[in-house]
Amino acid sequence: MSPATVLDSILEGVRADVAAREASVSLSEIKAAAAAAPPPLDVMAALREPGIGVIAEVKRASPSAGALATIADPAKLAQAYQDGGARIVSVVTEQRRFQGSLDDLDAVRASVSIPVLRKDFVVQPYQIHEARAHGADMLLLIVAALEQSVLVSMLDRTESLGMIALVEVHTEQEADRALKAGAKVIGVNARDLMTLDVDRDCFARIAPGLPSSVIRIAESGVRGTADLLAYAGAGADAVLVGEGLVTSGDPRAAVADLVTAGTHPSCPKPAR
C-alpha cells in the first residue's frame, strides 16, 4: 500500500470533525440555519471590479509552515483587510492543521461588509450548508479532494445556496475537471497538497488554457507587489494572500500596497 499523502491525512481528520459536528447539529438543523441566514453578497461583482483584486486571508497556521501568527481577534484583522481595500476576506476554518474554526468565520462575517470565503477541505454536503449558515458568500472546493461526480454535485449545491465556489486546481488535468464541472471561478494553487511542494510556474502554465469567461485567482506565493504584478502579467484577476499578510506586522498597509499595485494603470489587465 502506498503511503498516505498529506492531503489524505488532512481529509481523514476533516471527515472525523464533520461527523462530530453533525452529531451535535443535524443536517436538517444546519440546512434550516442556512435557509434563515441573510442572503449572500455578490461575489462575482466584487471579483469583476477593475484591477487585480486582493482576497485577504485569516490564517493562523499551515501544514507547511506551522504556526504563522497569533490572531487573538480575527474580526479586527478582517476589518484591517477591508480598510486596506481587500475585495474578499478568506477565513480558514480547518482546525487540526490550520488552527481555524467556524467561530473565526462568525467573527469575520459580523465585522465586515465585503464578501467572505470559507476556506476548508469540503468533503461532505453538510459543510456547504454549514458555510452558508455561518455567513459565507463563497466556498472553497478542492478538485484533488473530490471525485468528479462529487465535485459536480458539490458545485451545484454551493450555487443552489447562492454562494460562489472557488474551485482550486494545481495541474492542467485538474483545471480541465474544474471546467467540465462548470466552475465560474478557478483558483490555481502553486502548492501541491499531496506533497506540499511549491511550483511557482503553475499559474502561468495553467491560466492560458482557461476561457476568458472564467475568473482566475492565483493562490500561494504572494509576498509583495512584485508577485502580484507577475501573476497579473500571467492573467490573474485576483490573488489570494494569507501568510504574507498575517506575518507582515501591518496587515492593513500590506493589503493597501497590493491593492494600489493591482489598480495602478501600469498593472497588466486580464484578457476579457
UniProtKB/Swiss-Prot annotation:
Gene Ontology biological-process annotations: L-tryptophan biosynthetic process
Question: One GO molecular function term?
Answer: phosphoribosylanthranilate isomerase activity
Q: Which SUPFAM superfamilies match?
A: Ribulose-phoshate binding barrel
Which CDD domains does the entry mention? IGPS (cd00331)
Keywords carried by this UniProt record:
Amino-acid biosynthesis, Aromatic amino acid biosynthesis, Decarboxylase, Lyase, Tryptophan biosynthesis
| Associated pathway | Amino-acid biosynthesis; L-tryptophan biosynthesis; L-tryptophan from chorismate: step 4/5
| EC numbers on record | 4.1.1.48
**Looking at the keywords, is Transmembrane present?**
no
Catalysed reactions, semicolon-separated:
1-(2-carboxyphenylamino)-1-deoxy-D-ribulose 5-phosphate + H(+) = (1S,2R)-1-C-(indol-3-yl)glycerol 3-phosphate + CO2 + H2O
Q: InterPro entries attached here?
A: Aldolase_TIM, Indole-3-glycerol_P_synth, Indole-3-glycerol_P_synth_dom, Indole-3-GlycerolPSynthase_CS, RibuloseP-bd_barrel
Q: Which HAMAP family match?
A: IGPS_B
Family in the record: Belongs to the TrpC family.
Q: Return the protein name.
A: Indole-3-glycerol phosphate synthase
* Source organism (scientific name): Mycobacterium tuberculosis (strain CDC 1551 / Oshkosh)
Gene symbol?
trpC
